[in-house]
Amino acid sequence: NIRESEQKLSTLAVNSGVKITIGQPIPSIKTYNPNLILKSLWSGGTSAEHRRQVTLDDPAVIIFTSGTSGRSKPALFSHRRMIGAGIAWSLRTGMSSDSKCYITLPLYHGNGLAVAFSSCVEAGACAVVRDRFSVRAFLSDVRTYNCDSVVYIGELWRYLSQSPQQLDDSKNPVQVIFGNGLTFPLWDMVLERFGIERVVEHYGATEMPASALTNWTGRPGYCGFIPPGHPDTDNVVLVDEKFKVVAPGEVGEALLRVPGNIYRGYLDPQLDENKLWRNLFESGDLWWRSGDLLSRDTEGFFMFVDRMGDSFRWKGENVSCVEVEEAILSTGKVREAVVYGVSIPGESGKVGMASILPIECLEEGQTLNDFLYQLQELLPSYGVPHIIRLVEQHHETTSTMKIIKANLQIEGFKQIEKYPHFILYQGRYVRLTRDLLSALELGRLNLGFR
């Protein structure tokens, strides 16, 4: 990602054992100018001797994980997975040599490279690559270049859905969209507003050991489908905290069987071990831990629920950050919401905190209490955020448009001079002043938790 700081790029390069870069110079790393390389006398081919040394399971690329909740990790993507992804996704989307795919996600991201670009290579299709996503340019681009497919992450459609609606939004050549993160509340609206015929939603991770779960059926809100009796049914299991398989409809961590018991997910083998679970159901089996919570119904449809690090426990209940965020957005008063758990002195567990970019001013008492009433109608009492802060600009994101929660969790509720904060006190949201904050930090503020 060329927008990263020199220091971060240098750290990532050193940690990953990079010896040569092509393009942007990185301190202490030998760099080649791509324009000079293209002007050289290189034939464009690779010697047969060198090709014979490369196997399907050798790394094709190293993709850094997004780093939304911690440090980015270098994940390996083999030639086998790259070819397999291209075949699978080109078939799922009906891509052909006549197709044009609009790629506005970076090519150092799994969706941009392995899902979309590899499909174009496999199908012989045209990849229309934009430097970065733009709400304003989206429809103009797909019309200008006659793109019939678009790769996405959920945030892309959330930003587009918040843009002013035009009468001709549906007059565009896009027929199929594919990616992950298109939630149930957005699904039908996106198809209707933009005139899209089909969605292929999936669940996957850059470092996962097998093919992604895909939902090609068009059933809204689901990220995967494995019909009962299919050979792959037993290769994906959902388990509880004690690694017992959960019943249909219940939520559990997704485990994927490692094919052939051979797994290389990261450049650092120690990181591989942290993701694996051995001898779980029978001697010699090997499973990859996703760290994500999913549910599966009796028909075999999977729904993404939350990341395990994206939930917190309060009043003996697990609170899903995603569920609370969706409730906040559904009020119609908020443009962007980030939910996370924060510690309160003297209390066990974590209370919910939401950092909110409102559409209009929320600070006035009645408006804020109307907002609280809406949340109380949508959420159980333990799910209503106890602390909210209001911001005037979009939150900091990764290069793949994912909001970085780690920094917000570190800040907690101590930036009251910089952002207006409100705390749920005596049944309503009140301004968190310096005096109230001091009382809260000393455990002297009775918030009615007990």
Question: Where do the protein language model's features map onto the residues?
Answer:
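Short beta-strand->loop structural element characteristic of the AMP-binding/adenylate-forming
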Residues: 1-20, 73-76, 103-104, 125-132, ...
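ANL superfamily adenylate-forming
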Residues: 20-56, 83, 210
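Gly/Ser/Thr-rich phosphate-binding loop
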Residues: 122, 139, 144-152, 161-222, ...
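AMP-binding/adenylate-forming catalytic domain of the ANL superfamily
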Residues: 379-403, 419-447
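AMP-binding/adenylate-forming catalytic core of the ANL superfamily
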Residues: 204, 242, 256-286, 291-383, ...
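Conserved AMP-binding/adenylation subdomain of ANL enzymes
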Residues: 83-100, 108-149, 163
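ATP-dependent adenylate-forming carboxylate-activation enzymes
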Residues: 1-11, 25-27, 125-144, 319-324
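Conserved pre-ATP/AMP-binding loop-to-beta segment of ANL
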Residues: 44-64, 71, 94-100
